[in-house]
């Protein structure tokens, strides 16, 4: 496509071009010229100009804009220097270019929580519900149908007998579901109440390593029970209040929230009409506090799923920075710091900087994002719990290029950081609402980079230095996740001096060989902490299973002639997942270890995505449950 000389000149000096066909933006302004999106880069370093995205209806309007204004003021400084020299950013400001699209605009919320735990409530009676779904174990459902007086008023006797017969026939070891056509029903206000009733029965028998709530069964039957796109209400029943978290977790992850599919019309009004209404969820038998906590977990799982599903055109390092700062703003009272390439190198975080240096040449700089939440009544000087997440926005493998079709889907390589951001927001929100008690500060570190291939990419045989001051000889640029985590765990242990350090990552394919697609593989330096993590996995539905922790067996895998260690193993048949965790642990501060610091590594490469490739939000429930238990 030919462009005017003016466009070429201006683009060369001031603009960053990115192909993009969508013109909607959460910020309402988009640059689109001949289907080409232009990002204006304003101001010198430290100036009051940052990127802004502007919409032009034609080439002529673009030309007039260029003549009229060579730089675009985009508000306040995106960052300020703190007394320690770190780059600090708040939730309203940005350290890089704005995106033409924000992934949250493509999110359709799936769950909306109702304060009533009854099948029918005054609020619900005002709405049109085509389907009413009940999910639970047989005994819990029988109790609900017997004691909920609103059912007798709204469901006829014939339908109730069909429901009872189905519950009696349900198998103990397997989930099952059915849909009963009831026809149009009207309440006293002549509003349609329900036309179908769906029953989802959860298994009552599970193995000892599984979640006793039967949440895995809910995922199997969720689509058939309540996923038909109709306006619907879902009532979840349980005899154990502790089960609601895992059941809501499972229900949420069954319905992806992100989509960029066209609606078949450019009319926003028609688009709006085609969006399905969210499911209204009621938790029968749950306290108000439990319902609030379940809602927070559901929203956090949706956030993590959306981030994983968003393409790297939007969810690049800057997109992840934007998501983190937006979460901080939603919670309120959260302090934030963001290091980009220059600050990372200045402060000795050589591993994150190295992994992201190729993408940096194209403007996609790596980042270390720090969010700090101090609960009410807790001193900021108290030792925190630290969460460290791997956030590789896209992984090509670098010069150790992924081949044989293994690269598609690598947008999900930031699943650990996404889940930790969701968990951080849920914990902070629950602490503020009083549904979870936090007795110490909570720190989140998102180690973000794009592992790109290019002339600026790190090479095998390069030697880099981590924040711990240890040198690493690269023998596999596709083993980059452990590199970014190395800087994160070192900072969390050495600088933050956390009591407990948890890192989470889609780290190794070997994890799936070891523990499969439903369990994460965990490595821990403390027996009690490991057992607690397994317990919390069962409570939350985010199952976790221990892998060996044995430095004396695994450290030799990283021997190097020229550096403190290599970054990948010599013997790929020697417990690769444990070895990868060992590499991360080698960068945890030695003095912190000697003083009894507790470390947990969660490799969730398998459970982070469904077989379809969509994100599951795995890790949110596990972390919320684990941090809550640590504060009891």
Regions found by a protein language model. Name each.
Residues 321-632:
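A generic structural signal for tightly packed, nonpolar segments enriched in small/aliphatic residues
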